[in-house]
Amino acid sequence: MNYLTMISLALLVMTGVESGVRDAYIADNKNCIFTCYRDSYCKTECIKNGAETGYCIWIGEYGNACWCIKLPNKVPIKVPGKCNGR
């Protein structure tokens, strides 16, 4: 049993699992994306919300939208479905 625990722990360390963060399209509390035209805007918004960095994805799945790297789980992200505010 100890071997199984040690192997599992080693795999987690080797794969670099970071709990509490993810890469995603940042959204407001109404599931609306942050529309962008410049990387600097997204970088500012992402960092302000606790991400490592961010950039603008042009003509992506949701149009021109901000993509954040290592965004905390507490920050809303775009989920499938409509924007409820526009």
UniProtKB/Swiss-Prot annotation:
Share an example GO biological-process annotation for this protein.
defense response
Q: Where in the cell is it found?
A: Secreted
Query: What InterPro entries does this protein map onto?
Result: LCN-type_CS_alpha_beta_dom (IPR044062), Scorpion_toxin-like (IPR003614), Scorpion_toxin-like_sf (IPR036574), Scorpion_toxinL (IPR018218), Scorpion_toxinL/defensin (IPR002061)
Pfam families in the cross-refs: Toxin_3
What disulfide bonds does the UniProt entry report for this chain? C32-C83, C36-C56, C42-C66, C46-C68
Q: What is its main location?
A: secreted
> Which residue windows are coiled coil?
none
Give the PROSITE patterns listed for this entry. LCN_CSAB (PS51863)
User: What tissues express this gene product?
Assistant: Expressed by the venom gland.
Protein name, as recorded:
Neurotoxin 8-related gene product 1/2/3
Organism of origin is Androctonus mauritanicus mauritanicus
Give the source lineage, highest ranks first.
Answer: Eukaryota, Metazoa, Ecdysozoa, Arthropoda, Chelicerata
